[in-house]
């Protein structure tokens, strides 16, 4: 397994935990991807590079802009920041593996800018 795949597995695990903590509807899907990655890494890399992760309003990346579901504001801000940081880690690992989804670069730029601005 490549270093980027190890990083990807670690980030996926942490993302699954975070999504579970905040009650996100895609938490189980991300956890399933983690299990699937161990069984069929090539297939999971293709899925993680897919539009449902990186393109448009329904993508997981876009979920980082979701409204607070009722958590204390300071907690929500920390969780969303971590969500973006994990998506950055996943996006960078995918790029290191040769991922070509055009949405990844745009989201990485946005996430880094938002985190730097403390948005």
Locate the predicted segments by residue.
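Short terminal alpha-helical segments
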Residues: 1-38, 105-119
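Residue-level recognition of alpha-helical structural elements
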Residues: 1-4, 8, 26, 44-46, ...
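Intrinsically disordered, low-complexity regions
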Residues: 14, 24, 57-59, 92, ...
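Compositionally biased, low-complexity repeat tracts
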Residues: 19, 52-54, 87, 94
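Amphipathic alpha-helical binding modules
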Residues: 64-119
């Amino acid at each position: 397994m490549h270093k980027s795949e190890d990083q990807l597995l670690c980030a996926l695990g942490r993302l699954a935990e975070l999504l579970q903590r905040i009650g996100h509807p895609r938490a189980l899907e991300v956890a399933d991807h983690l299990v699937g990655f161990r069984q069929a890494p090539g297939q999971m890399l293709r899925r993680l590079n897919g539009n449902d992760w990186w393109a448009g309003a329904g993508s997981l990346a876009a979920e980082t802009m979701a409204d607070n579901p009722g958590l204390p504001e300071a907690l929500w801000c920390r969780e969303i920041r971590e969500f973006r940081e994990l998506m950055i880690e996943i996006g960078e690992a995918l790029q290191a593996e040769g991922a070509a989804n055009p949405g990844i670069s745009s989201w990485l730029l946005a996430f880094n800018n938002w985190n730097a601005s403390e948005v």
